[in-house]
Structures are given as structure tokens and as C-alpha cells.
């Protein structure tokens, strides 16, 4: 069974605000944790990455149009802290995020997918030697930090971009699923060209900080991973093409 809208449903325009990330060579990893080393050279091709994390209103449309498949909403879906339509969609598993990408690809004709870890880090650093997507200053330096992310995420466009390409919330708000299987020692064997992670594993990779940790794991090189079926309220995703 495909992922087409339900019979009789109104076809509504689905648009993603894409940012073109230029291809090139960069130095990946090199942070304080063992799984971020060794620092190594990576070459990625140009790709597009969404300006924002997938929002609740976007994910709700996916749920509505694929309800015949019986995919449940994330367990936190109706809690007030996550209910604003411009909040990031919180709680999708990696499997849910991949299904969303397949649905959006069919809906729009664009080949939508999750970014690789290498692509995410390329977008975050953007030809700069910086600790965080917004620069070298720690998260505590961000505007109004004392009052943000205490009870949950914030709308994806609540604050102006601090990134040179214009990304919103990159490294903030929710952990973002990546396409790769995760291995702590992958950097020891990673190919130079367009690395896509190991061939198998038990956990899928994610990048960026989250509201639950007051975004303190937001470094560009920081890696995290959980099993692909889990649904956590500080996990979301951003699509690539």
C-alpha cells in the first residue's frame, strides 16, 4: 500500500523551505569524546537541507493523510507543551521520520530523505572552524537563554537565524534524526567521499542539542544515537534532498 493521501482528501500544497548547502571538503569530528575522533577529512556533494525542523502542523498532515496505514501519533502529541502548530514535531521514531520522508517525496515529487551525519555537520559548520552552528560562544550566550527550553521546545521560527546560511534552530530545540546507523568507532574506517555510516547496527544517529538538556550538547561535532523504534519528546527531524 502506498503513502498517497486518503481517497477523497483535498490535495493541499506542501512546500519545504530549502537551503542549498554547497559541496566541498571539511574536517569532521575532533571533539572531546572518543566517538568524535579521529578528526578526519570528508567530502560531500551539494545537497539541500530544510531551513527548519519538521513542524507539528506538517507532521499532523502526514498523520491525517496516512491514517489508513494505522501509524499512531507520537505518545506526547496532545500534551500542551508540544501543541503549538509551529513547534517541532516531537516524538517521531526514526522509522516514523523515514515514513514521513517517503510520504513527502510522493506528495511533492522531490526525493526527500533524512540527512547523513556528515551532511548535518557540513551544514552546521559551513566552511567555518566553529564549536556550534551559531559560532564559538556557548549556549548560555544565546538570546534570553535563562527563560528558554525550560518546559519544552519552542516554535521553529521563534527567533532569528544566527547561522550564515539562514538555518533556524540547527543544534537547538530537539535532537535531529540522521539516516546513518551508529557506531562509536566509525570515524576510524569512514570513507572520505559522502560517508553514510556503517551497513548495520542497533542504533540510529542523531545530531544537535535538545530542550531537555537545555541544548548543552549542541556542538557541531557532538554525536548521539538511540534505537530506531524509540519515541522521545526531545527528538524530531529535519529533511534533506
Set out the residue ranges of the language-model regions:
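A general structural signal for alpha-helical elements within enzymatic catalytic domains
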Residues: 9, 64, 102-105
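Generic low-complexity, intrinsically disordered sequence content enriched
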Residues: 5-7, 67, 108
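A short glycine-rich, aromatic-capped structural motif
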Residues: 11-74, 92-95, 171-172
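Functional-site microenvironments in short loops/helix caps that host divalent-cation chemistry
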Residues: 21, 27, 31-32, 74-224, ...
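Short amphipathic alpha-helical segments
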Residues: 15, 64, 118, 240-241
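Residue-level detector of intrinsically disordered, flexible termini
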Residues: 4-6, 220-221, 239
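N-terminal amphipathic/basic-hydrophobic helices that include classical n-h-c signal peptides
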Residues: 1-12
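Short, structured beta-strand segments at or near domain termini in extracellular proteins/domains
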Residues: 233-241
Amino acid at each position: 500500500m502506498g503513502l498517497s493521501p486518503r481517497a477523497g482528501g483535498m490535495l493541499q500544497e506542501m512546500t519545504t523551505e530549502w537551503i542549498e548547502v554547497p559541496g566541498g571538503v571539511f574536517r569532521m569530528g575532533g571533539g572531546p569524546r572518543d566517538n568524535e575522533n579521529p578528526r578526519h577529512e570528508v567530502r560531500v556533494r551539494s545537497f539541500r537541507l530544510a531551513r527548519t525542523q519538521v513542524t507539528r502542523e506538517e507532521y499532523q498532515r502526514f498523520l491525517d493523510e496516512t491514517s489508513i496505514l494505522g501509524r499512531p501519533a507520537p505518545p506526547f502529541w496532545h500534551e500542551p507543551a508540544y501543541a503549538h502548530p509551529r513547534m517541532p514535531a516531537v516524538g517521531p521514531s526514526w522509522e516514523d521520520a523515514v515514513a514521513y520522508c517517503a510520504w513527502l517525496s510522493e506528495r511533492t515529487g522531490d526525493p526527500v530523505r533524512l540527512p547523513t551525519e556528515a551532511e548535518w555537520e557540513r551544514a552546521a559548520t559551513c566552511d567555518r572552524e566553529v564549536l556550534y552552528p551559531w559560532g564559538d560562544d556557548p549556549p548560555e550566550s544565546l538570546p534570553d537563554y535563562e527563560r528558554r527550553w525550560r518546559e519544552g521546545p519552542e516554535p521553529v521560527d521563534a527567533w532569528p537565524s544566527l547561522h550564515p546560511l539562514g538555518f533556524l534552530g540547527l543544534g537547538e530545540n530537539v535532537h535531529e534524526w540522521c539516516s546513518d546507523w551508529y557506531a562509536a568507532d566509525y570515524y576510524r574506517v569512514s570513507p572520505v567521499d559522502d560517508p553514510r555510516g556503517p551497513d548495520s547496527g542497533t542504533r540510529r544517529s542523531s545530531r544537535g542539542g535538545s530542550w531537555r538538556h537545555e541544548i548543552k550538547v549542541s556542538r557541531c561535532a557532538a554525536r548521539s544515537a538511540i534505537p530506531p523504534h524509540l519515541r522521545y519528546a526531545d527528538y524530531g527531524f529535519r529533511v534533506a534532498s
